[in-house]
Amino acid sequence: MATQRRSHNDRIAAGEEKEASFKAEAVLGEKSNIAPAVPAHIIYKLLGFTLAMIIIPISSYFLTLNSIFRGNSTFAGATAAIMANVVLVGYVIVAMKEDQSEALEAAAAKETKTESKKEL
């Protein structure tokens, strides 16, 4: 069984366009939330770890290639891979600590809110 799509004129005749415009006016009367979805300090932290993920492994490869491993690119590449994993583990640790601190702040705020309600 096929369904029909109603054209713009059919919707106007049915009064759906007026309902939509009334809803739009109601929404426009409210203040919109223009705050960013992610706080700036998190973006800066992510950018820092992104740069570290690029710079540290590449620099460790070239620094160890001729100075420590005397031209052995396999060991220098392994060093770069290890350093990339070190940066990754560092990011995970920082992210977990930040998540825990946000949870503690939320719990403290909730606790103060319940205490203030009890006082009233």
Swiss-Prot record:
The chain crosses the membrane at residues 38-58, 75-95. One of its GO terms (cellular component) is ER to Golgi transport vesicle membrane. Residues 1-37, 96-120 are cytoplasmic. Keywords: Cytoplasmic vesicle, Endoplasmic reticulum, Membrane, Transmembrane, Transmembrane helix. GO terms for biological process: vacuolar proton-transporting V-type ATPase complex assembly. It comes from the Eukaryota. Disulfide bonds: none annotated. Residues 59-74 are lumenal. It is a multi-pass membrane protein. A motif (Prevents secretion from ER) lies at residues 117-120. Its main location: endoplasmic reticulum. It is found in: Endoplasmic reticulum membrane; Endoplasmic reticulum-Golgi intermediate compartment membrane; Cytoplasmic vesicle, COPII-coated vesicle membrane. Pfam families: VMA21 (PF09446). Belongs to the VMA21 family. Required for the assembly of the V0 complex of the vacuolar ATPase (V-ATPase) in the endoplasmic reticulum. This is Vacuolar ATPase assembly integral membrane protein vma21.
